[in-house]
Amino acid sequence: MHSFDRRSKRLSWRILTYALKRMRTDPALDHSETPETLRARAGSTITEDGIGGTEALRIWTDVLAKACISVDHPRFFSYVPGAPTEAAGMFDVAVSAANVYGGSWQEGAGAVYAENEALDWVASLAGYPVTSGG
């Protein structure tokens, strides 16, 4: 693992600032890119010494994010993989920072409980019985 030093603290603030700005911005619809275009623009991102967090964030912001179709764009109706609200994004940050594994009750009872609550709510909206599952 790594230590949380001044450099890590600066990177954390840069990432959180990016996340807040992105969640508060009406996104461009953007478009996909070919692997060749991304290789030319992003370069080699996996290196023996690493590229560092600041450079990784720059590549994400300037190259990779722009090669993703923003699913919170008002004209995007194909998929809805997550809740496009600022609160949902911030809770994603909180859960990621906690670094929990929610794949089974033993390791992540709290996360699994929260997920089950959400699934039960969605099932009730669809009119499924309380015994539904799967």
Describe each PLM feature range.
Residues 1-131:
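N-terminal entrance/gating region of PLP-dependent enzymes' catalytic architecture
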